[in-house]
């Protein structure tokens, strides 16, 4: 029987997801390997400032600019998700996705303590790791990497070679990331996910709240299924006095 050593079995993935140390084994190489991200042939740093343009960039609060500045790629934010919810279709999709990784939290709840870790990858990308502490469960870890595509546009690398193409813009002092396509990246080949398939359009908002804190809100909405996922929470800057526990 022909084997494919680069593919994980369902059993190994399940064991991997339940590893107590998973959320603490964090460095650029391991995260890139988990997300099957190949180092870029021509590394280029993700610059939100460049993607937005100077006018839009300086319309954002100074604290938002500091969090997304080119030199600010390493930080740890602590806070709480006031709400993590999903529709029936969303919960089903999240549970199925646990066989290939965890692109979205598979559980729901309110007032969920969480930690967000951000750090740079060797090829200029920015890795994001969200650790949810649902009551009575092992920490749930969701990872992704924002990086530039071959064409210089912004994408987010998710588990199982899934990629999400993103538009980024600023409006009324809020930073927005909105998906415009999903595709699987297999080497140099791309297989686009049809627009009518789940999950739908992902919309992330970064809202500065002042006093060293911000709100993260994510909505995923499908054209037919409606709202599939919704998360919102407040987090504190590492330098904020209230960040220490």
Give the label of every model feature segment.
Residues 5-6, 163:
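Short beta-strand-initiation
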Residues 9-12:
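Serine residues within intrinsically disordered or low-complexity segments
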């Amino acid at each position: 029987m022909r084997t494919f050593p680069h593919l994980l079995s369902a059993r190994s993935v399940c064991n991997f997801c339940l590893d107590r140390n998973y959320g603490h084994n964090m460095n650029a190489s391991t995260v890139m390997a988990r997300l099957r991200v190949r180092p870029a042939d021509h590394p280029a740093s993700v610059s939100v400032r460049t993607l937005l343009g100077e006018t839009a960039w300086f319309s954002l609060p100074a604290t938002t600019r500091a969090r997304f500045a080119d030199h600010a790629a390493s930080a740890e934010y602590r806070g709480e998700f006031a709400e993590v919810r999903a529709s029936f279709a969303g919960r089903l999709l999240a549970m199925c996705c646990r066989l290939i990784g965890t692109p979205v939290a598979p559980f729901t709840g309110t007032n969920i303590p969480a930690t967000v870790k951000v750090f740079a990858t060797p090829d200029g990308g920015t890795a994001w790791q969200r650790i949810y502490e649902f009551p009575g469960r092992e920490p749930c870890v969701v990872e992704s990497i924002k990086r530039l595509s071959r064409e210089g546009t912004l994408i987010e690398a998710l588990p199982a070679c899934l990629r999400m193409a993103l538009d980024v813009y600023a409006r009324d002092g809020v930073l927005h990331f909105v998906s415009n396509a999903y595709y699987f990246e297999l080497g140099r080949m791309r297989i686009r996910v049809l627009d009518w398939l789940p999950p739908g359009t992902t919309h992330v908002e970064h809202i500065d709240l002042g006093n060293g804190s911000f709100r993260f809100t994510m909505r995923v909405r499908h054209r037919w299924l409606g709202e599939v996922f919704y998360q919102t929470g407040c987090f504190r800057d590492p330098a904020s006095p209230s960040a220490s526990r």
